[in-house]
Amino acid sequence: MNDTIQATDAAHAHSTHQHSMRALAIAAIGVVFGDIGTSPLYALKEAFSPAHGIPLTESSILGVISLLFWAIILVVGIKYLLFVMRADNNGEGGVLALMALSLRPLDPKTRVAGALMALGIFGACMFYGDAVITPAISVMSAVEGLEIATPHLSHLVLPITIVILIALFWIQRHGTALVGKLFGPIMVVWFIVIAALGVYHIARVPGIIAAINPYYAASFMADHLLQAYVVLGSVVLVLTGAEALYADMGHFGAKPIRLAAYGLVMPSLVLNYFGQGALLIQNPKAIENPFFLLAPEWGLLPLVVLSTVATVIASQAVISGAYSLTSQAIQLGYVPRMKVLHTSELAIGQIYVPVVNWLLLFVILCIVIGFKSSDNLAAAYGIAVTATMVITTVLACVVMVKVWNWNRLLVGAIIAVFLAIDLGFFGANLLKVAQGGWLPLGIGALLFFLLMTWYKGRHIVKERTAADGIPLEPFLQGLLAHPPHRVSGTAIYLTGNDKLVPVSLLHNLKHNKVLHERTIFLTFVTRDIPYVRDDTRLSSRDAGGGLYIVKAQYGFNETPDVKAVLEEFGRSHDMTFELMDTSFFLARETVVPTHLPGMSIWRERVFAWMHQNAAKPTDFFSIPANRVVELGTKIEI
């Protein structure tokens, strides 16, 4: 009897696990695969762009389709799904998480560590270059279906694109949790539809299946040489969004993403690209828009609507990714503090960063108006994607050798293959710098300069503060030996270093000559892991006389919460805290550029400007503004 019950329980648990896995896989399809899933809208069309000079013969069509097929198999199916996704930082993926993981076994003062950090930051910056192009090219290419369905409405493509994008960014502040539940099912329908369209045309021209043979890809490269290499820059468009598989791993887990990729996404993409190839063999004039011309005439308008919805979902995933990446960068100290709002009480990862939102919209609208069509924008797209792919491969190599201790020869062989592919794609896209590739490169370079300036500037400020600082615990012992006047209430001193006396305390003692009965020195520390367990978050030292030194540790995917820290500290010390009865003392630092060693004076001025415009601690830590006492201090750098 017991064996029967245990078997039933085990079967129920297995069934529940399978159901949960399927639910996560469907949710992942709605978030992770939007970008790569909408690539069929423009990838093959761009590969046969008239500028490339590739004739629309059967052999060249087979060659390009073969290149697309093997790019998906090697880069998505093998590199990302099998290798890169193994390199998780406590379950979290993405270029910054991978960078933090690769730096863990290294001495941070070495040149290698510095180079890897710079690589990781540059990869993050290139993501923003991608984030401004994805919504523009995706939505525009979907709306351009109107030119095929109803040619007399072609003049409305640009205005409709602009309205959709403004609406998309406008709703961000309200959160997308409600409509987000529909993303997965809608994208499942999208992948089934594009697969069905592909199968219909493959059945009419079954010879297209021969493109599975890599001989056709190699033959195409050999026959067309430089032209074929230029085409590689368009082939990479089938891989846009591949990095999202890794970056969103923390939200869904590796298994559901692999299940969705191998079970639905990759087969659907391959079938659709082969279907487009079959259509072109049958009717070369269909190169005008091979994706939409897959559909029968009666299905054109519904396909335009479905495509537009799918591209909005793809854009939403990129926008959410930009918020998450910004939040990570703030916690890791690469970006100034910004106001981060949580839009869902249930989903901790759903955040909204107003500054990022409106900057993205402004740049995207400028791009749409400036480039005017998805064809013009396609040249700008690949370079950000391929640069991030190269950086991910290099960082993954370090993790394989230094963290996993894999055999160096084995790692060398694996990485040589992946780097050859990545660098081939990156080199092909460098040829398109003048046609639009300058855009993501320029955005990435500007952001890289700003992030490195901020990181270096904060490092200099910490050095100056530490050089002039007073050790905290000996100071407190001396203070208690000759105490100033004690006043009732609680004072919280927020400080960046739990070993040094906060400047705000020195100013308070100097000007007000009082010390609160209960005084807490609170320091927030960001670890190189995404999340910190609640039972290990807080550490505290009782300095006596009602003085406490508290350190709160957070992961780079978490937002520091002063209220939660005080509640947890209160529970462990049998105290109660009321935010409205607590005074928070902060040092308001004014950075003064000087000719002291550190950075060039103009970079110091840029840093000072960034420092001045960073979000106030009251906004960032959600502290009631009327409970804060800010005491000014100047720091020369």
From Swiss-Prot:
Signal peptide: none annotated. InterPro entries: K+_transporter, K_trans_C, K_trans_N, Kup. This is Probable potassium transport system protein Kup. The chain crosses the membrane at residues 24-44, 64-84, 113-133, 151-171, 182-202, 225-245, 261-281, 290-310, 351-371, 381-401, 409-429, 433-453. Disulfide bonds: none annotated. Keywords: Cell inner membrane, Cell membrane, Ion transport, Membrane, Potassium, Potassium transport, Symport, Transmembrane, Transmembrane helix, Transport. GO terms for cellular component: plasma membrane. Transport of potassium into the cell. Likely operates as a K(+):H(+) symporter. GO terms for molecular function: potassium ion transmembrane transporter activity; symporter activity. It catalyses: K(+)(in) + H(+)(in) = K(+)(out) + H(+)(out). The lineage of its organism: Bacteria, Pseudomonadati, Pseudomonadota, Betaproteobacteria, Burkholderiales. Pfam families: K_trans, K_trans_C. It is found in: Cell inner membrane. It comes from the Bacteria. It is a multi-pass membrane protein. Belongs to the HAK/KUP transporter (TC 2.A.72) family.
